[in-house]
């Protein structure tokens, strides 16, 4: 019988580019959300309570946008909260479909170098939400990029998870190495379970259902993790009310204890039990990529563009190598347009389009 001592609660905004608003508006909103989350993290900075506010940055692209526009003082504040463990930066560029090949997936992880080297962020976790699967090349790439744990919060609307979730396991990569992985509940589930909303619903309705589910699948760990966004939904801001709700729940002495956490804290709780976890190998099956079929012509263009960008890389490298004299403008201009082109390629292969038609 499952006995859960601690429920790890991870709060983030779900980045869904173009779903609730046009793309430029989504990017602007997420910059505002990061600033708001920073303020809330600072408000709890001196608290050692398990309910103290913590924020997880779901994707790197929106953080890069924020860093580009933030003031030096705002960046210093963010760095301080990240260093204190009140904010965690995770490693995925966006919520990506399995349309990306190995080379393109590697491109999406390039921002980690900038975020680590230029800003000093510790990035050891990665997460994807909504999407149903990822290609088998991903665990090797994440391990090479210094990622120690990967979580998936799958949307089962027209989709499904390949394993009985929630499930913690080792995802064995083609190289034979393994990456800690968690196939968890949908990313909105914390709020739906009543966290931040109704202690009565959580205690009398949802938590008994969770425990029944854990018993049914023989879940063996004393910890489990649930994610939650703002009650607004996708592309929503930080939600301050989680703090008081979790503190009140923990003060009641009822089980389970809830810890407002970031992915790094979750994985720290899992690692002592790593030896007992199962090992799975292969693709993380995708049930849900409607976009391929709904826009086959555009998908073909994007694939062709990927090949052209690789040719451009080859020509650019040759031009730089054979130039009669060093030309800093050549390298600078190439890098500028290269980044923009690859970002646009990634955005096409980003999730959620062509569904429900």
How would you label these PLM feature ranges?
Residues 1-357:
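Catalytic-domain carbohydrate-binding cleft regions of carbohydrate-active enzymes
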């Amino acid at each position: 019988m499952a006995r859960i001592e601690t429920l790890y609660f991870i709060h983030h905004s779900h980045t869904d580019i173009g779903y609730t608003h046009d793309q430029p508006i989504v990017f602007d909103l997420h910059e505002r959300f990061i600033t708001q989350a920073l303020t809330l993290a600072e408000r709890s900075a001196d608290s050692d309570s398990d309910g103290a506010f913590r924020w997880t940055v779901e994707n790197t692209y929106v953080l890069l946008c924020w860093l580009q526009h933030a003031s030096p003082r705002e960046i210093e504040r963010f760095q301080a909260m990240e260093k204190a463990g009140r904010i965690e930066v995770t490693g995925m560029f966006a919520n990506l479909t399995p349309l990306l090949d190995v080379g393109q997936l590697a491109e999406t992880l390039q921002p980690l170098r900038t975020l680590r080297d230029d800003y000093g962020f510790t990035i050891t976790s990665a997460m994807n939400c909504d999407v149903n699967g990822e290609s088998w090349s991903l665990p090797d790439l994440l391990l090479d990029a210094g990622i120690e744990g990967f979580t998936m919060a799958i949307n089962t609307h027209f989709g499904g998870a390949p394993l009985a979730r929630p499930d913690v396991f080792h995802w064995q990569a083609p190289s034979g190495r393994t990456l800690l992985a968690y196939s968890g509940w949908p990313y909105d589930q914390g709020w739906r379970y009543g966290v931040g909303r109704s202690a009565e619903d959580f205690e009398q309705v949802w938590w008994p259902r969770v425990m029944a589910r854990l018993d049914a699948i023989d879940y063996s760990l004393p910890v489990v993790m649930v994610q939650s966004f703002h009650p607004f939904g996708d592309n929503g801001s930080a939600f301050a009310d989680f703090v008081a709700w979790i503190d009140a729940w923990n003060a009641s002495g009822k089980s389970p204890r809830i810890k407002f956490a970031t992915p790094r804290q979750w994985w720290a709780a899992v690692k002592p039990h790593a030896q007992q976890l199962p090992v799975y190998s292969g693709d993380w099956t995708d049930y849900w990529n409607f976009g391929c079929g709904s826009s086959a012509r555009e998908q073909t263009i994007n694939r062709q563009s990927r090949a052209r960008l690789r040719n451009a890389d080859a020509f650019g490298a040759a031009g730089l190598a054979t130039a009669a004299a060093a030309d800093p403008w050549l390298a600078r201009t190439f890098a500028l347009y290269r980044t923009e082109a690859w970002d646009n390629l990634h955005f096409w292969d980003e999730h959620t389009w062509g569904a429900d038609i």
